[in-house]
Amino acid sequence: ASVEYDNEEDSPQIDARAHRPLDKRQEAAPTLRPVAPPISGTGYQPRPPKQDKQAMKKGPIIYPDAGGCKHPLDELGVLCPTGCELQTTLLKQEKTVKPVLRDLKDRVAKFSDTSTTMYQYVNMIDNKLVKTQKQRKDNDIILSEYNTEMELHYNYIKDNLDNNIPSSLRVLRAVIDSLHKKIQKLENAIATQTDYCRSPCVASCNIPVVSGRECEDIYRKGGETSEMYIIQPDPFTTPYRVYCDMETDNGGWTLIQNRQDGSVNFGRAWDEYKRGFGNIAKSGGKKYCDTPGEYWLGNDKISQLTKIGPTKVLIEMEDWNGDKVSALYGGFTIHNEGNKYQLSVSNYKGNAGNALMEGASQLYGENRTMTIHNGMYFSTYDRDNDGWLTTDPRKQCSKEDGGGWWYNRCHAANPNGRYYWGGTYSWDMAKHGTDDGIVWMNWKGSWYSMKKMSMKIKPYFPD
C-alpha cells in the first residue's frame, strides 16, 4: 500500500489493517522479536460442571458509541476507528469549526481594539485623576488660607464691634453735644444780631476822637489802644471804620480781613467784596469796640491803602488746639478794579509756609505751580478771573471753594473759605466735595479749617 497525504494537514495517512505494513522510505528496519517467556502454571484444572442455561444467559451489554465501527456482535463493543473514519469525522468537524474560529478571530480583534481603547481611556482617567487630586490639594490649600483670612477678618470685626465702635460712638456723642452747644450759641448770637438790626444803625460803643490816614498814622498820633477807629486815606474819600491792632509787633496794623467764629458768610458776590461786608468790631464789655468782628474791609479800600506807599501784610492763623503761626510779606499791593484787583506779594518771612508765592508744599511740579497766588486776579462766584481755564462754567474755583480770593487753579491758601467747627473736615462735608475750608495748606494741609485767621497791613519801612 502507498502512503497518501492530506492536502489540508500535510500528514501521512496509512491504510489501516490488522498489521501495520512497513514504510521503508521513512521507517528503519524493525528489530528482532524477542523470545517469548515460558508458560507459567502446573497444569489444567478439571472441567467445571455444566450450569443451568437459563442462569448462563446474560443481559445485553450496552457500549457507548465511541465514534467508530461496531463488531457484528454487540457483546464485542466498538472497533478501533480507522484513519479514513477519523479523516471523515475531522472534515465534518472542520466545516463547523472554521467559521467558529473566524468568528472568534474577529471577536478577538474587536476585543483587542476595545481593550486598546479601554486602556487609553483608563490612562486618560488616571491622568485626570492625578490632575484632579493635585487641584483638590491646591484647593484645600487655598480654602485653608481663605478660612484663615476670614478668621482674621472676623476677629478684626469682632474686636471693632467689642472695643472700637463703642469708643467711636462715645466720641461721636461728645462731638454731637459740642455741636449742639455751638448751634445754641450761634442761635443766640443770631437772635441778638436780629434784635440789634431792628433798631437804626447807631454807634453802640464810643469811637475815639483820634483818626488818621490809616492805623499807623493813628498810632503815631497817640491812639495806642486796639479798637475800632475812623480813617480817611485821602481828602477825596469818605471816612470809614476799621479795627486797628495797636499791640502786635509795635502796633499800627489795619485789619483788612478777620475770621474767628463763622458768624459771617464769605461766599459773596463781586460788588460786596468790592465795597466790603461784615462786622468791624463789637464791645467786649468795655465802653469801646475792643473786639474785632468777622469782616472783609473791601477791595477798593484795600487797594487804596496799599497805594499810599510801600505796604506789608501780616497773615496770622490759629488752629483748634490754640497753636499759632504767621506769614509776613514785606511787599503787598492790590491793584485797582480795572486790573481785577491783581495781587502782588514779596519778601516772605514766617513759620506758616510761603503759600502765596510758592504754592502748596505738598505738591510738586505743575500741580504746585497751579496753587501759586502771587500775580493772580481776584475772583468771586459771579466774576471768574481764576487760572482754571475750562469751557465748563461749573468748573470755577470761587464757586467750589466757598469765597472770593486770588485763586489760581485753585489754591494753597483759602482765608475766605467756609468755616468748619473743630478743624478737620472731609470731602463729603463740603458743598462741592472740595477743600473749601479756611485753609493754609503749607501748615495744616487741605482738610483742616482754621479756628482763626486774619490779614493786617501797615506801611513798610526798610530797616
UniProtKB/Swiss-Prot annotation:
The keyword Isomerase does not apply. Glycans are attached at residue 367. This is Fibrinogen beta chain. PROSITE patterns: FIBRINOGEN_C_1, FIBRINOGEN_C_2. It comes from the Eukaryota. The gene is FGB. It comes from Gallus gallus. Residues 16-27 have a biased composition (Basic and acidic residues). Cleaved by the protease thrombin to yield monomers which, together with fibrinogen alpha (FGA) and fibrinogen gamma (FGG), polymerize to form an insoluble fibrin matrix. Fibrin has a major function in hemostasis as one of the primary components of blood clots. Its main location: secreted. PANTHER family: FIBRINOGEN ALPHA CHAIN, FIBRINOGEN C-TERMINAL DOMAIN-CONTAINING PROTEIN. Residues 206-461 form the Fibrinogen C-terminal domain. The record marks 17-18 as: Cleavage. SMART domains: FBG, Fib_alpha. GO terms for cellular component: collagen-containing extracellular matrix; extracellular space; fibrinogen complex.
